[in-house]
């Protein structure tokens, strides 16, 4: 299937190069660094590798030829794999399939199939299920053999999935799962919509019935209210004209008094501004002083911590000094003991040499004496053989007895020596026991210290963790506060924009507020809603109480009204105007007090903050309005109190003083007063949250410092624990050494005891033998008494010679025993000297360790002392700066006192002027009260009718046939009844009937879509289940077939052994990993990581060929896979490859000549030009043993 590979500008292949791959084994050879492996990299790159690292580069531009000494760099890299598709294996209608990848130096890249641009997804789809791919078994590069065995089981299963051909199923499954997820999301969303529409449909069916009843009652109510409104409007117009004339005179007097008050107010404001300037300067100075104080506290805390650490380090240094002195004392004693031992050893060795010389001398003397005895015995034998026989028997008995006596003496001497050695050994054992107990106690004490240190570390670590948890909670709180602040800020911004744009204010009012006439602007105060400050919770009630009057323009005289009348100010809609100079002094109901009654919240004007100038206006507008909890409370209070009071309930219902009421839920728009109050509240909350965030951030800073401090404390505890652990390890090593010495001493004592028992037994046996020999000798003497006379002289000579021989033998035996003792003493002293030398070496190492610790401690002390000195200098500078800040604060305090005194003087004069204004205002209020009452009633009536029925009482003419009301009470009763009927109907959707039909159609359509999505979901779930079942079956069948092939090929490749593939236990085989077990012949079972390089490679090759045997890949690339093989394994490797040539073709990159012998096609790659790879034709004999290509 693989036909050729073409390269152009790819890595070191600067020129266009083509490699044809005919059937069989194609071998690529060349020296190291010639670019052979770039052929494998090119194949991986074309097949979709996205990792520059796997291509042995830093980024993808590294695949482009970089140039050489004689060539410039290439602008692009290109590689093409050509597949033979005459059999139609690939889903492309062409005899050849060219898969090309190209990348430009600009970073752009492209994939092409038969010169048509495609996506990487299309390339992967083309080769999926064929065994071809960068992660499949068709590309085995350097190092991948080892990774195939050492990879985890789940990563390794990808190779078997490719062999089973289920990778395409996995892609389909992933796509189906994505579609299922989208369907489920849409199904959930559509289900919510269907439920919502169904609920709305049910509601509309109920609303349609209400709509008809509401229409009939509202039409009759409109008819009656219109007639009543026109009659009331005409009556109120007459009253209003009379009140206006009386008000103008009083307003002129009010303006004079107000001018003086404004002048004094300007003086007071100037003084307050100066006082504010001084206060700002004082705050800045106080802030600077606070920062200096904080810096002093921080540096002082750090200095105190350093001082504590310095004391601890000095204590540590003193401890090191004491330990060093103790170790030096101990070392001096040990050196003296070592010298004594060496001296004793030298004396013992000299004594041993002297005894050896004596032993040799006495041995020669013994030989001489034995020769003399033999000569005498020979002469005696010649005289009388019979006598000699008797004498021989006696002599033998005596000799035996002498030997027994000698054994007895030797045993006695040995027992004496053993007794002496036992005393010495027992003393050494006691000393070793004392040393062992002392070191064991030291180890136990160190273990206790380590346990204490571990407990301290755990406590410190718990403190650090707890503080960090608190710190994280504080940071989360800051995040939550910032989110709240952001929401409130956004709401405030929207409200501010509405306020700036004057949303909700009628066009005529905006035109009046935007007028440019400076003279007229002097009389303009603003609209009612903008001049009040009220709590946000009460604001909706004030909006309800004011009604349209919240948009009334407040003026100080009649110039604005005159300008509107003259046409100087052009307005598009009607404008309500309130003149401060014409307000009445009192209104009906001002003096009525309902405070403290059940259900009463308070009087409306008392809920408002405003400037002093506007207080009469507030009393005028709201002085007769009371806020109560419910409508029932309002009705009850109206019956108890006199007429003239208005009531507003907590839900926004209004019970007016004329008996009318406005009830029901408020509209969706926020009132002007509510909006202004909400904006003020939002700004206040912004300040509140900003303060909380600042405080929380301070707390975070503090906690961060605490964490650092606690972490440092934890570090100190851990350092102490490490110190005790180090000492404990040294003590355990010493304990081990002492234990070994104790064991040796105990073994010596035990051996001496066994030797003593043995010699005691030998002595008893010898005594028994001596008694028996004495009896035998006595009998022999009696036998030879008759013969002694004849041979007396000979016997005397023989006895004398024998005695001499026995003496010499006894002396020789004594010298031998002495020599044995000397040798034993030399050996004992040699062992003692070796032990002392080892102890001395260990003491010197411990001594050096303590000196190193002292050096580190001194350096730490110097560092801390330097920091303390720097902190002292900085504290002095900060104290000077703080004194300067205190002096500045004192100066500012004196200036502030002067300004406050000036402000008090101006305020006194201003209060007098305000009283004069108030007196004039009261006069104006008294006169204008009647007018305002009529105007308010008229305006409220007009606004209510305009709002309810779009009838303009102000501009429209009364109907010509206006009916007169003969029985007003019956009409009011009918209106009240109709109102109740309309209200009882509740909220009515007049468009319910039309909307009902449209909604029914939409519901039917959505319900059908929901059923379609449900069916699609079921279908996708069935598809995924079928894919899982097919994949599971294919995977298990494939794994079992490959497993059988692997077992056979492994035994064939290794000449025996055992190998197996094991599927890990899992609920789903598709999620289980695959383990490889390989045991070469003659070796025990062990981990794959312990296999040799050759065994790993041959095992991987056997596995690879097992996969090929089950599902042949069109080709297989092996990049220096045979590098770890010896000659025998290469032969097996080549044999395995040749067996699969009828199923696939192989491209092998190698240095081995034995592998080259199996090649049907041989390519050489060299760098005849530096940095540029070139394909060359070679012969087998042109390649050296190390893969070098010899020049022709």
Swiss-Prot record:
Cellular localization per UniProt: Cytoplasm
SUPFAM superfamilies, A to Z: P-loop containing nucleoside triphosphate hydrolases (SSF52540), Smc hinge domain (SSF75553), Tropomyosin (SSF57997)
A single GO cellular-component term on record: membrane
Binding site for ATP: 31-38
Keyword Nucleotide-binding on entry: yes
Key words of the record: ATP-binding, Coiled coil, Cytoplasm, DNA-binding, Nucleotide-binding
Domain SMC hinge: 522-636
Family: Belongs to the SMC family.
Domains (record comment): Contains large globular domains required for ATP hydrolysis at each terminus and a third globular domain forming a flexible SMC hinge near the middle of the molecule. These domains are separated by coiled-coil structures.
Complex and partners: Homodimer.
UniProt-recorded name of the protein: Chromosome partition protein Smc
Source species: Rhodopirellula baltica (strain DSM 10527 / NCIMB 13988 / SH1)
Gene behind this protein: smc
